[in-house]
Amino acid sequence: DTHGADYLATQEGKKLPVPHCIRGTVGWAIADALAPFVKEAEAVIEKPTFGATALPTALRDYDAIELVGLCTDICVISNALLVKAFYPEKRICVDAACCAGVTPESHANALAAMRMCQVEVR
């Protein structure tokens, strides 16, 4: 996520009043272990909400798409279903070992929901 200083005034902030991923903070920064991959990335998409509406356009030329991240039960599922809705015939995969949910139960529920929507979960 990328949120502004006004996060708590947003709809998300009112329903999830936990300031996180505020632009310019340590919690917003890319983890050091992932920084080399960002430098090689063709695109880095910032998203102010659960789903990245720019993601389908950025992924247009790919036949297979793998998603990982936090939180499985919020952002990962939102983006997996968003991309699957745009590209129902593309192979969309989520690597469960590279994801984590708010709770183990909500993580498992999100993975099950994605499987039901024809997102491959490994």
Task: Tell me the role of every PLM-derived stretch.
Residues 1:
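Short, solvent-exposed turn/loop segments enriched in Gly/Ser/Thr/Pro and often Arg
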